[in-house]
């Protein structure tokens, strides 16, 4: 059990609702959101645009007033406290650095507003700029820094007065792909060294999985699932979560047989799942939707390989760490595309070739057939 799992609850949100009312209509942005954030953890709100993650963050910061519900911070009702009394640091999508000020002055600005002594301001600014690794930039203006450096200065400004809570609203959205990877690692390092409880908002699944202690997946103003990155990825609670987090294949089937379950597909093919640790046994003699990740499948160049699904290679993509195969199979005479990830190219298999797809189903999971509707609404 990690230190965060043992930690006390820093922030508690209960039954939070937010309705934006217009002259002719209203929009419910948050619908009964409840969260507990532990001391020192990096907690991510993850979801597509319009799911309510930024509205949740703005309610925590005090920029939006909830329509109902309660926000407790360190055991104190925080719901109606104005933003300037919440001791919260925040980094926005646009870093909001003052262009006419030096880096030192940007970071020191909040401390001067708080009327700290000159000596204490210098000590704090020097310490935090060293933490973010930009000691040599103190006299420069923001326009003289790269995007990644500006992001770190915005982070330093949010941390310099030792906030009890740090809020990050899609802070990497303006950076290129390679810099995003570097900066998410830097944010994690800085957050851990500062030991500050942090709530991070993003729509980027890879970003959330790589830096978070826990993740709340949101959809349509509700929390769909809360868990560690591996729990969210490996054991999603619904088809919607499974489809949103990473790549996934969904295949309609029926579970038959005793002992090792036999999955019967609409293509009239069957595969046997051995040593299953998933929930397949609970679907005995019932229909379900098989959920399997691309890396849990394997391609054989022998189209007659036993215990497999037959298909045809449509596209082969080299992605660096993996080779992704787009395979067309048939269910009820209807074509369906599935993804299969391999460590390297399968020898002798090219676009247009017939192949067999093996399912390593030890961790495969079934969802109720009625959840198939969620795929059309993600």
Please tell me what each predicted stretch does.
Residues 33-44, 98:
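Pre-Walker A (P-loop) beta-loop-beta motif of ABC nucleotide-binding domains
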Residues 46-48:
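The feature captures the beta-strand-to-loop junction immediately N-terminal to the Walker
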Residues 61:
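Helix-to-loop junction immediately C-terminal to a conserved catalytic motif
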Residues 69-77:
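Conserved ABC transporter NBD signature motif
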Residues 81-89, 93-243:
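ABC ATPase nucleotide-binding domains
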Residues 248, 258-378:
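Non-catalytic connector elements of ABC transporters
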């Amino acid at each position: 059990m990690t230190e965060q799992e043992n930690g006390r609850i820093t922030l508690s949100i209960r039954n939070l609702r937010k309705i934006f009312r217009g002259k002719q209509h209203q929009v419910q942005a948050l619908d009964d959101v409840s969260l507990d954030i532990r001391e020192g953890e990096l907690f991510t709100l993850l979801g597509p645009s319009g799911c309510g993650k930024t509205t949740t963050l703005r309610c925590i910061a005090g920029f939006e007033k909830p329509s109902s519900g309660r926000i407790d911070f360190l055991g104190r009702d925080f719901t109606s406290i104005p933003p300037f009394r919440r001791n919260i640091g925040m980094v926005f999508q646009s870093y909001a650095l003052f262009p006419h000020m030096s880096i030192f002055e940007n970071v020191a600005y909040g401390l001067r507003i708080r009327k700290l002594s000159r000596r204490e301001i210098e000590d704090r600014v020097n310490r935090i700029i060293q933490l973010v690794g930009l000691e040599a930039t103190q006299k420069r203006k923001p326009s003289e820094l790269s995007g990644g450096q500006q992001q770190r200065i915005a982070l330093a400004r949010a941390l310099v007065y030792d906030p009890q809570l740090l809020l990050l609203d899609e802070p990497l959205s303006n950076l290129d792909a390679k810099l995003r990877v570097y900066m998410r690692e830097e944010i994690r390092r800085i957050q851990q060294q500062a030991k500050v409880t942090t709530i991070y908002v993003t729509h980027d699944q890879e970003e959330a999985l790589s830096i978070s202690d826990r993740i709340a997946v949101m959809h349509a103003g509700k929390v769909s699932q809360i868990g560690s990155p591996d729990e969210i990825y490996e054991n999603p609670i619904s088809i919607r979560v499974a489809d949103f987090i990473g790549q996934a294949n969904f295949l309609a089937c029926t579970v038959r047989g005793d002992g090792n379950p036999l999955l019967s597909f609409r293509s009239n093919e069957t595969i046997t799942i051995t040593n299953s640790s998933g929930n397949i046994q609970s679907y005995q003699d019932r229909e379900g939707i098989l959920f399997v990740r691309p890396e849990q499948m394997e391609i054989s160049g022998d189209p007659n390989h036993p215990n497999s699904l037959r298909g045809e290679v449509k596209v082969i993509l080299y992605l660096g760490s993996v080779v992704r195969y787009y395979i067309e199979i048939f269910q009820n005479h209807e074509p369906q595309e599935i993804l299969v990830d391999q460590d390297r190219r399968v020898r002798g298999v090219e676009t247009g070739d017939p192949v067999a797809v093996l399912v390593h189903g030890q961790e495969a999971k079934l969802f109720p057939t009625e959840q198939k509707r969620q795929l059309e609404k993600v």
